[in-house]
């Protein structure tokens, strides 16, 4: 149960961080069969699909390394579904896949734009 609470807190911190950096949050926890995107946002003309990762005691690099190719495929699949469901042409839309890494206590946030 603690992991779920921590994950939700990390997603809230990430959304606030993105807002402070002038992104518009469109959707949180977009789920379909076979995938989920933690945060969907707009950064100017970009559609940004964010994966949020939290670890108590690891470096930012270690957190990024934990994102496996299969997870990237699922996020891309889910992003494509979102775009198609909202009549957004995936071939002409500006799309970016970012990672927000939150590490340590007290927490530090690192934003990896165009991470995969």
From Swiss-Prot:
Q: Which superkingdom does the taxonomy of this entry point to?
A: Bacteria
Source organism of this protein record? Idiomarina loihiensis (strain ATCC BAA-735 / DSM 15497 / L2-TR)
- Name of this protein: UPF0102 protein IL0423
Gene Ontology molecular function terms on file: nucleic acid binding
Q: Which family does it belong to?
A: Belongs to the UPF0102 family.
Write down the NCBIfam families for this protein, in alphabetical order. PRK12497.1-3, YraN family protein
Q: Which HAMAP family match?
A: UPF0102 (MF_00048)
